[in-house]
Amino acid sequence: MERASIETAIKLIIAEIHNKLSEAARIAKAAEACVQNGAIAEGVEVAMDIEQPIYEAGRLQDAASLLGRMKRDQN
């Protein structure tokens, strides 16, 4: 893979990690609002939706790390 392609891919991956974590933060904020208003069960249910975007952000980070190593190995 060419160096420029790797750098472009890393930039896109990092942007997507930001999107996924922003989504998780929005979900957490909604869950917090629920529990602050006494809807504990609803807050827990809402918070369960955090798992997928965090999982996806983690896998994207794995990909970015791999591409970073590939880029370093090209030097």
Regions found by a protein language model. Name each.
Residues 30-71:
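Short, charge-rich amphipathic interface segments used for partner binding and complex assembly
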Residues 3, 69-75:
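Alpha-helical linker/edge segments of TPR/alpha-solenoid repeat scaffolds
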Residues 1-34, 62:
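N-terminal acidic leader/helix
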